[in-house]
Design a protein with these regions (language model features):
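Active-site metal-binding motif and surrounding structural segment of the metallo-beta-lactamase
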Residues: 1-26
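Divalent metal-coordination and catalytic microenvironments
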Residues: 5, 17, 58-61, 87, ...
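Short hydrophobic beta-strand that contains or immediately precedes a catalytic carboxylate
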Residues: 58, 224-230, 235
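Active-site metal-binding loops of divalent metal-dependent hydrolases
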Residues: 6, 30-31, 62, 88, ...
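Conserved small/polar residues in nucleotide/adenosyl-binding loops
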Residues: 240-242
């Protein structure tokens, strides 16, 4: 399985999928994950059937980010068919450089890397190359994401505000200003995706322990709020009408 970067807005299922299927995890060579993975250097590739998947190091949204260029070898061994851009290039936007700024690198440095990744790598692909990003509208990883799920390099070159002709400094100034505040859990999720941690199955088994009525009343007396998360239909079926 391929991870383009360490997502910040959700905990990925790569460790669980690896545990259940034995599938190996592929990450950018600079990922530095604590679990075993196949490091993908720039332009390294993996072939399966008629498909060749080549890695491009595209840091900027995150330091370790990669994009995956897909070749349909039944059509051409040298002309890209599509590219999975992760959170580097969205439809209508590019990835925020501030979410993963950490010790040793800041949002300005990541924004500079993002500009270089876009202009020196992704925009060098043919205009007809299909673009499949990791997110659509609604994600906090960008501020102008489209509801569309696929585009082309050519369409993004002409329509994406962040890809219009400008200097690197102009791009950095634009992309580092006016970003909405990121939720506090983003940094936690990103760290979790980089390290070995209990799977969802293990977490649920350890966490979902039933409470007795007396325990609930005790918690309530100390300020705990009980939230009923049942579906309205289930609630109605269980409700005792007096």
């Amino acid at each position: 399985m391929f991870l383009t970067h360490f997502h910040a807005d959700f905990v990925a299922g790569h460790l669980e999928l690896h545990e259940q299927t034995g599938a190996r995890i592929c990450l950018g060579a600079k990922a530095g994950a604590s679990y075993q993975f196949i490091p993908l250097e720039n332009e390294s590739h993996i072939e399966f059937g008629n498909v060749r998947m080549a890695a491009l190091e595209t840091p900027g949204h995150t330091p370790e980010g990669i994009s995956l260029v897909v070749y349909d070898m039944s059509q051409s061994r040298t002309k890209p068919y599509a590219v999975f851009t992760g959170d580097t290039l969205f439809i209508g936007d590019v990835g925020r450089p501030d979410l993963m700024a950490s010790v040793g690198i800041n949002d300005v440095e990541l924004a500079e890397k993002l500009y270089q990744s876009l202009h020196q790598k992704l925009l060098k692909l043919p205009d007809e190359t299909l673009v499949y990003p990791a997110h659509g509208a609604g994600s906090m990883c960008g501020r102008n994401l489209s509801t569309e799920t696929v585009s082309t390099i050519g369409m993004q070159r002409s329509e994406n505000y962040a890809l219009q002709p400008m200097s690197q400094q102009e791009f950095v100034d634009m992309i580092t200003q006016g970003q909405p505040e990121a939720p506090a859990y983003f940094a936690y999720d990103a760290r979790l995706n980089k390290t070995e941690h209990p799977t969802l199955t293990e977490t649920l088994h350890q966490s979902l322990n039933p409470l007795s009525l007396n325990e609930i009343l005790d918690h309530q007396s100390r300020g705990m709020q009980v939230v009923d998360v049942r579906d309205p239909v289930d609630y109605e079926l269980s409700l005792i009408h007096i």
